[in-house]
Amino acid sequence: MRKVILVITVILLSGIITAQPGRAPQVEPLPAGFKPSSTNTFISQYPAVNQQTRQAIFRVVAPDATSVQLRLGGNMEMKKDDKGVWWITTEPLVVGFHYYGIAINGVEVADRGTKTYFGSNWESSGIEIPEGPEGDYYRFNKNIPHGQIRSILYWSEVNGLERHVNVYVPAEYESNTNKRYPVLYLVHGWGEDENGWSIQGHMGNIMDGLIAAGKAVPMIVVMPSGDIQTNPDVRTASGNITDIFVKDLIPFIDKTFRTKTDRQNRAMAGLSRGGMQTTTTVFSNMDKFAWIGTFSGFFMGGMGGPGGGTAPSVETAFNGVFKDAAAFDKQINLLFISTGTEERGPKEQVDALKAHGIKHIVYHESQ
């Protein structure tokens, strides 16, 4: 029997080996300094990225097209060569992850050279402009323990539907079975979904590194959807997401995982719209949270915020949650507010809160 299996295996392998050269794609050498983007599909050479210049080359095979555009922060016209291939080399791009699309004769499609990512409310292409060694914090480190990211469905009584959530557990979770963990609820921004933090954002690698370096305590990170499907036929961003978080999600997580269930061990943070959902949820449920963070998502109205208008007083914002500064500081251990250097940030609002006497607040600007 073993000899028969061996013979069959040799025959199969021989067929595979002889078939491979005929199936292998023709790989053209890339221009000097360029490498395939880390977001590319397995056999795709393009888009290609130059880490030193931060430029990218995009390639689209569309011989019958009359116009092709790269849509990456704007519309960029691509040029066609004599083989029907369209090309463009960008100006230097900002480091980090970028969504993009390709418009062929005005119809926007994803670039089949890359994996797809859910952003701007559709499955688009993505490209990563890598940092240097300073970006190692979000890269996989083979020398440290790694946690798990679990994909879970739970039932929402508020929504009347099943909902999806991703949950990060630290590397020690399965071996340290008597230990309970604090929980961070981390909410995505508008146009993205609950997968963005772990895929585009490399959240798992970041948490693994912080925990291994002793810069973060081992914790559970819950990444829910910030959208609401109001009925089986319509998906919409409207609705009371706070009720789903508080009445459905938190009880489910506390029942399913070994969590510390008191407010001192529960935090919430969010990006953009997720930051606004975070402030709405936490400031209306101060008995359940002691830590809060917003990334480009803190807005009290007016005071340099989007839309202008008359600023509410610090005492009336969020139904008066800041009115008694000492009481706020007693309940909230940290209010972390961050924004990008290119954004119209909430610094004036933070300054007003500090002047009012709020001490447990940190403001940060990043690239």
Residue ranges and their predicted role:
Residues 1-4, 20:
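Positively charged n-region of N-terminal signal peptides that target proteins for export
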Residues 4-5, 339:
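Residue-level detector of intrinsically disordered/flexible regions characterized by low predicted structural confidence
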Residues 7-15:
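Bacterial N-terminal signal peptides
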Residues 15-16, 201:
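Residues in and immediately flanking transmembrane alpha helices
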Residues 21-25, 29-38, 44, 50-69, ...:
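Non-catalytic cap/lid and distal C-terminal segments of serine-dependent acyl enzymes
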